[in-house]
Regions:
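Surface-exposed helix-capping loop/turn segments at secondary-structure junctions
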Residues: 1-5, 75-82, 102-104, 129-132
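Short intrinsically disordered coil segments
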Residues: 25-30, 58-63, 137-140
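Hydrophobic/aromatic-lined pockets within catalytic cores
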Residues: 52, 97-100, 104-107, 122, ...
Length: 141
């Protein structure tokens, strides 16, 4: 593998406590080019931070899903439920499931943020008050 010095970044992985105790700055170079040290990096659509907290990734994902939920709320006035589901499966569900096995170990607080958006999508598409939100989620699959 050949490294491209201008595109290469470095990241020091440690817990939050270790970063606070000794903020370490790496001074690395490759072929006389300084390698930039970063605290987070997007790779294949996943944002990895130097603490492996998944907070930046899930925050970004929630922002994207929220925008799409707004579009879904506007769309529901013009199309039937089957078209809403199509929009959900094309524009919301992939963000909830992409690489979920990687960031599955996130904190309960971050998981709750994603879950609340998922539940909001179910409520938007199925306003039937006789169904519980869990039943609506099961209906979505």
């Amino acid at each position: 593998m050949i490294l491209h010095p201008a595109k290469t970044k470095s990241m020091l992985l440690a817990t939050r406590q270790k970063h606070q105790l000794r903020p370490l700055i790496l001074n690395l170079s490759l072929k006389d080019n300084h390698i930039e040290q970063v605290h987070e990096h997007r790779h294949l659509g996943i944002i990895i931070d130097d603490e492996f907290s998944w907070r930046p990734h899930i925050t970004s994902t929630c922002k994207t899903i929220s925008k799409n939920l707004y579009l879904l709320s506007q769309l529901k006035h013009f199309v039937d439920t089957s078209k809403q589901k199509l929009f959900y499966y094309a524009h919301i569900s992939p963000h909830l499931t992409y690489a979920s096995t990687v960031w599955d170990g996130c904190s309960d607080i971050l998981f709750h943020k994603l879950n609340s958006l998922h539940r909001r999508a179910a409520k938007l598409m199925m306003p039937d008050l006789s169904l519980t939100t869990d039943a609506k989620l099961q209906h979505l699959g």
